[in-house]
């Protein structure tokens, strides 16, 4: 049995023990994330492509430093996920390990390909969300109608977040949405986002996009997002120290001179 762990652009989690079953890792620039998919033909903003390419190149380096064998499959236009999976099949892999996809098309394609080609498919819990797919389905299927307010209330209870001993919400209310709609005062000073320097991953991604994605939307000169785990942790620290205290107050505020206000720019 030849196993390989499939990793897509939104699954670059910190390396712990999740790859204990195999040393073989496939990093896949799938067209569902990079655009011009054979079925879903939309193009994306060029900064999205830069972000995915830079972070995946960084992750490839980290994996190799940890001793993993990495197969990096680059994005090709007018393709589907199945072509990438077939490439791995032709290399002799017959046991795919994946995270929960959190993408309907991607999940369906992987499952159907595995079934048709006698591939063993093993799915692991994703770190992307606090609640697993199975638990989310179980909660939602209990009611005919299920809105986000009910879901968040259930999350508070099941995770025991800001819940009193008698089961009531801390502060006496389940939602403080009405307090999130303050207007931005003219005199208030809006904190700046951290400024990230250049890196070989960013430079390589920008060059790739400038050559191969000229027809995609937007401009990339203003790109300023964390690309490594260390940068993301620093970005989180800055958010908690400088922005979190007023995030709730101005969560719904907008201003023509400021793009981010007190938001974290994490999701």
What is each stretch, according to the model?
Residues 2-11, 16-18, 171-267:
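Substrate/cofactor-recognition hotspot
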Residues 55-58, 80-84:
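Well-ordered alpha-helical segments embedded in enzymatic catalytic cores
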Residues 13, 33, 78, 104, ...:
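Surface-exposed, flexible loop/turn segments at secondary-structure boundaries
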Residues 1-75:
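N-terminal beta-strand-loop-alpha-helix module at the start
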Residues 81-225:
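Beta-rich, aromatic/charged-enriched effector core domains that present basic-aromatic interfaces
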Residues 60, 64-71, 90-95, 212-219, ...:
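Glycine-rich, often proline-containing surface loops adjacent to acidic residues and nearby aromatics
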Residues 44-51, 73, 98, 102, ...:
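Conserved aromatic-histidine-acidic binding/catalytic patches
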Residues 9-11, 74-77, 100-102, 240:
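Short, flexible loop/turn elements at secondary-structure junctions
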């Amino acid at each position: 049995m030849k196993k390989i762990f499939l990793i897509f652009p939104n699954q670059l989690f910190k390396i712990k023990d999740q790859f204990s079953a195999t040393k073989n890792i496939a990093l896949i620039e799938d067209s569902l994330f990079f655009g011009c998919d054979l079925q879903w033909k939309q193009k994306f903003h060029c900064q999205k492509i830069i972000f995915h390419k830079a972070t995946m190149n960084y992750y490839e380096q980290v994996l190799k430093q940890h001793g993993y064998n990495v197969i990096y499959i680059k994005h090709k236009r007018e393709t589907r996920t199945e072509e990438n999976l077939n490439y791995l099949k032709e290399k002799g892999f017959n046991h795919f390990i994946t995270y929960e996809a959190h993408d309907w098309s991607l999940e369906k394609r992987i499952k159907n390909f595995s079934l048709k080609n006698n591939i063993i498919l093993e799915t692991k819990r994703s770190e992307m969300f606090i609640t697993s797919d199975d638990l989310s389905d179980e909660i939602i299927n209990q009611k005919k109608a299920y809105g986000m307010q009910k879901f968040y209330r259930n999350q508070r209870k099941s995770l025991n977040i800001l819940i009193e001993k008698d089961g009531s919400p801390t502060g006496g209310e389940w939602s403080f949405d009405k307090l999130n709609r303050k207007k931005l005062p003219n005199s208030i000073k809006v904190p700046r986002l951290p400024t990230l320097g250049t890196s070989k991953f960013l430079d390589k991604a920008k060059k790739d996009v400038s050559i191969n994605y000229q027809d995609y939307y937007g401009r990339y000169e203003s790109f300023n997002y964390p690309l490594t785990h260390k940068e993301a942790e620093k970005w989180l620290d800055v958010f908690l120290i400088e922005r979190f205290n007023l995030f709730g107050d101005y969560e719904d505020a907008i201003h023509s001179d400021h793009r981010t206000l007190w938001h974290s720019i994490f999701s």
